[in-house]
Design a protein with these regions (language model features):
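Short nucleic-acid-contacting surface segments enriched for D/E, G, S/T with interspersed K/R
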Residues: 88, 123-131
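Non-catalytic linker/capping segments at the edges of enzyme domains
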Residues: 1-82, 102, 107, 120, ...
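N-terminal export/assembly segments and adjacent metallocofactor-ligating motifs
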Residues: 109-113
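Acidic, glycine-rich low-complexity segments with interspersed aromatic residues
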Residues: 90-91, 104
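Conserved double-stranded beta-helix
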Residues: 115-118
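Compact, glycine-rich, soluble single-domain proteins
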Residues: 79-80, 92-95
């Protein structure tokens, strides 16, 4: 799709999210558009069913089909399969990062943390649908640093029942931090503290 069409869309299917993860969805990306979603198996979304923005606020809703053979059910826990709660939190960060790109932010995405996380349910192999609803409380582009940030509150539901609550989840886009030379050593081959 063309960049203007990408920015105008209000939903994305599984193929499109996978193409975004591989950096091939947008045919004419602006300079600096380097963010990606993770590829499977860490991609925790099958589709974005709603995305909208009103000024500094917005909303993004993603869904994932639960599969009996999902990789995490094979190891977490043996004899008592349950999706790790942290993967639900990661789905929220993935959606916020995608929102930043869709809203016009440029750079590579990074999760920046969250406030309160509460788990009051679980995802099991015979569940059908995980829905992640994120209300973006603030989206801002920071021209001096060339970065963008989204902060949101999220509810994760399984088969229509709320089971996780995540408050003040934060994801940012940052320019000139991508490490494209993997597995070779290079300028950005090591981690450590990021300057804000």
């Amino acid at each position: 799709v063309k960049y203007a069409e990408f920015r105008a869309r209000d939903r994305f299917d599984s193929r499109e999210l996978l193409a975004f993860a591989h950096g091939t969805l947008v045919e004419d990306p602006p300079e600096g558009m380097s963010a990606r979603l993770p590829t499977p198996p860490l991609l925790m979304l099958d589709r974005v069913v709603e995305i909208s923005r009103r000024g500094p606020r917005g909303r993004i809703v993603g869904e994932r089909d639960v599969r009996l053979d999902d990789w995490f059910f094979q190891c977490h826990f043996l004899g008592d399969p349950v999706q790790p709660g942290c993967l639900g939190v990661d789905a929220v960060w993935q959606l916020l990062g995608f929102f930043c790109n869709w809203a016009g932010g440029l750079g590579s995405g990074r999760a920046l943390g969250c406030g309160e996380v509460e788990f009051f349910g679980q995802i099991r192999p015979h569940d059908r649908l995980v829905r992640v609803e994120v209300d973006v409380r603030r989206y801002a582009e920071l021209p001096e640093s060339g970065s963008a940030i989204a902060i949101g509150d999220a509810t994760l539901l399984v088969d229509g029942e709320p089971i996780y609550s995540i408050r003040r989840a934060k994801t940012g886009l940052f320019r000139d931090i991508a490490y494209r030379g993997y597995p070779n050593p290079g300028e950005r081959a090591r981690g450590g503290r990021m300057e804000r």
